[in-house]
Regions:
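N-terminal Lys/Arg-rich, disordered targeting/topogenic segments
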Residues: 1-8
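A structural signal for multi-pass alpha-helical bundles of membrane permease subunits
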Residues: 9-287
Length: 287
């Protein structure tokens, strides 16, 4: 009984407060999941149900015709559909791993290694968080064109292997680790590389798992319209947008394309989210 009262005091202060918080969070969750639910039911509706007014929030006659039309159209493209899948998987894996490596190494240097200009670099990173990738699109194209990387995998990989958000996230977590742990490892003769990957990284597991989720989600959505013209190098999001761009007549196919495109990031999030919550609940260091 004492534990229950203590928990109520900590979270809501009263039973009514707990109920209010639960209702607000439930409504927020429904609001966030509604677009996904809408895409799924639209992809399962036959044509005659897609254009009903007022629109229905359920499917009366479930059909897979939209997915069949999508795959049939994709199979008639210039290259096999499996090639588009390979392109997206390859780009997503390379970008995700590269972001983890570069962001972790840079965050360790900025948070645990004293060197001239570290504070200025941290400020630059914080300012960079204010800009979206769209602002840098023209500059990225100019750099890729100068390097001769247009119409190659590098054109859609290099701009995303280091992001301010990933670096900021890792730096914030690493900055919470006690300096005494780093100093003890140095006294034992450990190098910065060993300290970073064998001591620091295991203790910031929630951070790099979260970074993996965000990095994969971002990499999976890369289109590279202005960078890739070779059909054999285009990722799935680009192809799906091309297929569903025929207007309102292909509303069901567009919904099916949206479902297929967002499925892998959702699966990755489901598997990694439990690990993030578990490590956040069980880990923590204090000086």
């Amino acid at each position: 009984m004492k534990i229950t009262k203590r928990r109520r005091k900590r979270y809501g202060g009263s039973l009514g407060g707990d109920i209010f918080i639960f209702v607000v969070l439930a409504l927020l969750g429904l609001f966030m999941i509604f677009p996904i639910y809408l895409s799924v039911i639209q992809s399962l509706k036959p044509v005659e149900e897609l254009f009903l007014f007022p629109p229905r929030l359920y499917v009366q006659n479930i059909t897979d015709q939209n997915f069949a039309d999508l795959l049939a159209t994709a199979s008639n493209m210039w290259v096999p559909f499996s090639r588009y899948i390979f392109n997206s998987v390859f780009v997503a894996v390379v970008v995700t791993v590269a972001q983890l490596l570069f962001s972790s190494a840079a965050a360790y240097a900025l948070s645990k290694v004293a060197f001239p200009g570290a504070k200025a670099l941290n400020k630059i990173i914080e300012v960079a968080l204010l800009f979206t990738s769209t602002v840098l699109y023209i500059m990225q194209y100019m750099v890729m064109a100068t390097l001769g990387m247009i119409d190659t995998y590098f054109a859609i990989i290099l701009p995303y292997i280091a992001t301010p958000m990933g670096l900021f996230l890792m730096r914030q977590f690493m900055g919470q680790l006690p300096d005494s742990m780093i100093e003890a490892a140095k006294l034992d003769g450990a190098s910065h590389i060993r300290i970073c990957w064998q001591i620091v990284m295991p203790n910031v597991k929630p951070a790099w798992l979260t970074l993996l989720i965000f990095a994969f989600q971002g990499a999976w959505q890369i289109t590279g319209y202005s960078f890739i013209y070779n059909e054999a190098l285009k990722p799935i999001p680009t192809v799906m947008q091309q297929i569903s761009a025929a207007g309102i007549a292909r509303a069901g196919v567009a919904a099916a394309a949206a479902v297929i495109t967002m499925l892998p990031p959702i699966i990755v999030f489901i598997f990694c989210q439990s690990s993030v919550m578990e490590t956040m609940a069980t880990s923590g260091l204090k000086d």
